[in-house]
Design a protein with these regions (language model features):
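Conserved acidic/glycine
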Residues: 1-67
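Hydrophobic alpha-helical scaffolding
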Residues: 14, 24, 50, 84, ...
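Generic recognition of stable, solvent-exposed alpha-helical segments in well-folded globular domains
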Residues: 23, 33, 59, 162, ...
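Short, contiguous strand/loop micro-motifs
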Residues: 25, 150-151, 184-185
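A generic alpha-helix structural signal
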Residues: 25-28, 64, 94, 164, ...
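Cofactor-binding active-site loop characterized by glycine-rich and histidine/acidic residues
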Residues: 36-39, 46-170, 188-205
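Residue-level marker for buried hydrophobic side chains located in beta-strands
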Residues: 149, 176-177
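Thiamine diphosphate
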Residues: 170, 177-228
Length: 228
């Protein structure tokens, strides 16, 4: 049963200090305010097309950006906060949502395809889970720290598990983050499969934990992954 205290560690935030907390709040809050403005302008009709907001997950991205230094980034369709937290310029993101040529995908990718050469962020095509094997391939080629984020339904795609196995076999410097909201559109996990993502990862001898989306927990375990 998932809960707000899943995997919690007492007093963990104190181990990171005030500067980490301030940077975390600054990045997460900036993303939240940006997203609220996007929502407001979409409702008023200034933004056309689907909008994939990061509201509610901004501090996940903020924590990852503080724990990982200049990785290759392969996010999912909700990539606004990931882009902003890792230092992406908000103006090209704004312009992308407005469909302008000055957008980060030249105004043709839209909300789900956020990319930036400046922060090594690769856009998502919309194909469920495709970012995982792409991230593994890029990491294998460049041997550079890599981050990929995907949802709980994406891990069920048949090309994701082999990508995890390839990463383990080749000891690649890659961090996999599965953002699990227990839903694939409107279908609960228990109606889709009988196994847990963390068990799949552990079966491959990966360092893997099932935790709540607490930013200090995320940073703590990402540091553990890097150490291992």
């Amino acid at each position: 049963m998932r809960s707000p205290t899943l995997g919690a560690i007492d007093g963990l935030s104190e181990q990171f200090g005030n500067k980490f907390a301030l940077d975390l709040f600054t990045r997460g809050n900036f993303s939240r305010q940006f997203e609220l403005k996007v929502k407001e302008n979409a409702i008023e009709g200034y933004i056309n097309g689907p909008i994939y907001l990061s509201i509610g997950t901004e501090f996940n991205s903020a924590a990852l950006s503080l724990a990982l230094d200049n990785p290759l980034i392969f996010g999912q369709h909700r990539g606004h906060s990931l882009y902003l937290s890792f230092g992406g310029d908000p103006e090209p993101l704004r312009d992308e949502l407005l469909g302008l040529n000055s957008g980060c995908s030249y105004g043709v990718g839209g909300s789900c395809c956020i990319q930036s050469n400046e922060i090594n962020m690769f856009g998502h095509s919309g194909l469920l889970g495709e970012q995982v094997p792409l991230a593994v391939g890029a990491c294998f080629a460049k041997k550079q720290l890599t981050l990929t984020i995907f949802g709980d339904a994406a891990i069920e795609e048949d090309y994701v598990a082999p990508a995890l196995g390839w990463a383990v076999t080749n000891n690649l410097p890659i961090v996999f983050i599965c953002e699990d909201n227990d839903l694939s559109v409107l279908t609960k996990t228990e109606d889709r499969r009988s196994w847990r993502a963390v068990d799949l990862a552990n079966s491959l001898n990966m360092y893997a934990v099932d935790i709540t989306d607490d930013p200090w927990l995320i940073a703590y375990h990402v540091n553990k992954i890097r150490e291992s």
